[in-house]
Amino acid sequence: MRDRSTRRLQRLLGGIAVAWAVGSVSAGAQQSPSGPLTLSDAIEAALKNYPAIKERRARAQAAEEDVNVARTAYLPRLDFLFQENRATTNNVFGLLLPQSIVPPISGPVLGSRSYDSVWGSAAGVLLSWEAVDFGQRKAAVDIARAQSTAARAQTVLTELDVASAAADAFLTVLAADESVRAARANVERLQVFADSVRTLVSNQLRPGADQSRAEAELAMAKNQLSQAIQITETARATLADAIGAAGAPVELTVGPLATVPDVNVEALNAKNHPAAQFNQASIDAVRARQQALDRAYFPTVTFQSAYSGRGTGAEVPGQPSLGSGAWLQVPNWAIGATVAFPAFDLFSINARKRVEAQNVLGESARYDQTIQTLTTQDVRARALTKAAVDIAKNTPVELQAARDAESRARARYQNGLTTVTEVAEAQRLLAQAEADDALARLGVWRALLATAQAHGDLAPFLAKVRQP
């Protein structure tokens, strides 16, 4: 019997240890929160300070700016150029394939191979505007918008995860504090009992084995108290990390969490969950890329207008000299239109379409998996809520019975009607009942939090928390 109760308490402490052990990586200590924190304060601090949220918001804003970047493709392009050079004037007939190494030379063939050089200059301005693209730029803007929507959805999902983690860490600290209180009360009772047994043994009214057993029980209770305190301190560190104030001391106020709330769980609409909306936005982004590929195999029409001037120090036989060439001497202007069509891009475009088709299937499968996971989480949360409510209704009965049993066991021992073993077992049972009663109320709140997280909206949960 004693071993079974001890194992129950150890499992309780172990469960709390597992709860606070799962946390996110923090980016460094933040400013210590001022005053005791309520659960709402903890969530607000997490949404304000947690680095992961700041990162997501910045990336979402960057994705929004990408839409503006895509829109700039509608604007005309204006390029300026000025060039000054000194070079030889030797020229030949013949073709030169397009490349970027050998500089071209304009003018007649002079038949010279001299290394004499002259000055040359050039300047110009070119105005280009892609007037017709058959929807290619609009498709690029649609891609940017879809990616921006996905980034915003991911930000909302991150906010939900961070807020839920902060709330869970808050409840974990409260549960750990209740375990400490129960363990400390058990130590105090066992201390009083051990002193009483010591007096009885000194008066030779009880055997010395009773004193040894009482002191052993007291030592075990003190060890359990030390373990509970360790778990509490570590849980507080996890909470500080969850609210973006890693390393800062945090003090909590229980507020309405000390009572059992009314439970009314709404039906799940998985499509409205931020995780589902993010997956849907990812599907839309892939489909936007598909639509862009549908517009890729079309020509583009570009209007161009240029004005330029050149100067050269080279002399052509029979022609008047134009000067030293250090400055512009011969002007030119041009206006026209260019139609460009990438004929052989058909093969790469078709290959990319096949890639995006598979990406749509993959993103759709992930969306279906998310809906299935959310549905399962909702079923589990409902089962957890029902069990938590039933336990919260039963623990007061357990606590009162344990108190009566402990009081009667002590009275029987004082009158010599039972052994120290029965008293020790009754006191452990009372310690467990006290912890169960305190944790049962928090268990209902934790179940409501799990339900709200499964539904993707913490507002109903926070409304209950803020109720007077």
Locate each region found by the language model:
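Small/polar-residue-enriched beta-strand and adjacent coil segments characteristic
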Residues: P36-T38, R77-L157, Q277-R289, A296-T370, ...
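Periplasmic alpha-helical coiled-coil/stalk elements that build and connect Gram-negative outer-membrane
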Residues: R2, T158-N272, L384, A388, ...
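C-terminal segment of classical bacterial N-terminal signal peptides
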Residues: W20-G28
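Amphipathic alpha-helical coiled-coil segments
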Residues: E55-A70, T158, V162-R181, V192, ...
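Bacterial N-terminal signal peptides that target proteins for export
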Residues: R2-G15, W20
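Acidic, low-complexity, intrinsically disordered peripheral segments
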Residues: R2, Q30-S32, R86-T88, A381, ...
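Short, glycine-/polar-rich solvent-exposed loops and beta-turns at beta-strand/coil boundaries
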Residues: T72-L75, V162, P207, Y297
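Bacterial Sec-pathway N-terminal export signals of envelope proteins
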Residues: A29-E84, T89-V92, E130-A131, G247, ...
